Amino acid sequence: MESFETLEKLLSYSFKNKELLIEALSHPSLRQHHEYKDDKDYERLEFLGDAVLNLVITEILFRNFANYNEGHLAKIRSYLVCKETICMVGAKLTLKNYIIMTHGEEVAGGRDNLNNIENATEALIAAIYLDSNIETTYDIIEKLWAEFIKVQNLTDYDPKTALQEWAQASDHHLPIYRLIKREGASHSSTFTVLVKVKDYEQTGTGHAIKEAEKNAARSLLHRLKND
């Protein structure tokens, strides 16, 4: 596991209370470990971090997209706080290298588990908020999410249409969407869709197939824009 100092440099933030940082990176599997004395893991911080992230992203969009209506802003926010985007932020921070977990969880692929990365990223946001204030947290989130907010200029009307137009302009076949996973009860399912254009592919999740397709298209457009 890498030094927390490296993570703090990536965040451009140094924790006053290091225990908050440790809690934000402590996987729930530790609670079943007989040598683990503390009863804290990142689940409570994740709960708070989810709310803080939604608040900050909402305010960023409100300030920067003055001409967009409520429905449009909600769609953009849905992308910015979805699992894929949060995990891409976590990947930028190489967060998987810092999560504290049991050997069994690690052997089972816990470091590459997207749920773990998403949860730890949200918990980290909460830890920063509790260690500092909303203004500092706002600045850090705005910096970490800047490239994903910027890509909205390309996808603001419909990411599926934007991806189709890119494919046609590049003389590629039209995008192909495929449902690869459905999780949860029938009334609250989460769908995962894979979109492929030529040799490029990306996944997206949502509570409806169309939402998952749009999030997959957004993620692929973001990748294409940065390649």
From Swiss-Prot:
Main function: Digests double-stranded RNA. Involved in the processing of primary rRNA transcript to yield the immediate precursors to the large and small rRNAs (23S and 16S). Processes some mRNAs, and tRNAs when they are encoded in the rRNA operon. Processes pre-crRNA and tracrRNA of type II CRISPR loci if present in the organism.
The protein's name in its UniProt record: Ribonuclease 3
Domain RNase III: 4-133
Residues that coordinate or bind Mg(2+): E46, N119, E122
Highest taxon of the lineage: Bacteria
Any one GO biological process: mRNA processing
Known cofactor(s): Mg(2+)
InterPro entries, per the entry: dsRBD_dom (IPR014720), RNase_III (IPR011907), RNase_III_dom (IPR000999), RNase_III_sf (IPR036389)
Species whose genome carries this gene: Rickettsia massiliae (strain Mtu5)
